[in-house]
Amino acid sequence: MPAETGHFDHMTAGFVGIPFAVVVFAGHFSAMIVLLGLAVGLFVGLTSIGGGSVLTPMLILLLRIPTMVAVATSVVFCFITKGIASYQHMRQRTVDRASAISLLWGSLPAAVAGWLTLLMFRKIDILHGNVWVNREIGFALVGLGACILARDNKWISRLRAVENQNSAVVRLKLIIIGALVGFMFSTTSIGSGSVLVILLGVFAPLDENHVVGTSVFYGFVISAFVSVLQFTSGNTDWHLLGSLLLGAIPGVVIGSKLAVRAPKKFLRVCFSCAAISAGWKMV
């Protein structure tokens, strides 16, 4: 047991070291952005709601970061912050690898298609491209808010109860879900967390722990893949990313420890209302 704990500590230290390395490379950081990262990290730790859906609209609406830069930076942010959680779920054996693989079969080509779409907008007309992505983010936030509000409703469990559990049918549905989420995540940095949890809860024959674990692992893999794509397009703001991570990683750790006492349902409702409001402004 001590060996495992020590290994986890080394692994965690490696992820924590990433933002410091980024900041050293970038040359400076902003205290305000570090505090923003801390707030996002705390919320993610308290509620398990994905970082992209919280961070991206804040970057666009509050900091006035260009849309495509905000999306690319949020994608890399998700990759790093979900790495620690993904490793922990793997240790706890709460990742259903078959479901994750089916999701990725649909997601990887769809993510490439989304990245090519952003690249096309950037080369042809970046102004209209930002407007298009803004609207997509707006619709995604409204949909996400509605999904989270519906999360505790009884119709979800009734819908799942009548689902055909044939493995081939479930696999096909997961591939389709993966394609939809992969394209949305690649173009908006939203969807790999809360939206996927809702969809897996309805369409996948998994218990709640495996739904969360599989979603986190999937989010880590797809964000790693999209991060590589975004790196080649040069949209990531490394100064911004390093400052955000300096606050976010300790925020996630603190939020996770406080999560047991947190009023999760109340926080989800507050986030849903904020997401719908922010999304409406961006449509």
Where are the regions that the model predicts?
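Juxtamembrane transmembrane-helix boundary motif
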Residues: 1-36, 61, 67, 90-181, ...
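Transmembrane alpha-helix interface/packing and boundary motifs in multi-pass membrane proteins
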Residues: 37-48, 179-189, 222
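Alpha-helical transmembrane segments of multipass membrane proteins
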Residues: 41-42, 58, 62, 86-87, ...
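Transmembrane helix boundary and interhelical junction motifs in multipass membrane proteins
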Residues: 48-55, 189-197
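Juxtamembrane transmembrane-helix termini in multi-pass membrane transport proteins
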Residues: 50-100
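Interfacial segments of multi-pass membrane proteins
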Residues: 55-69, 195-210
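Transmembrane helix-bundle signature of multi-pass membrane transporters/permeases
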Residues: 71-79, 104-108, 215-220, 249, ...
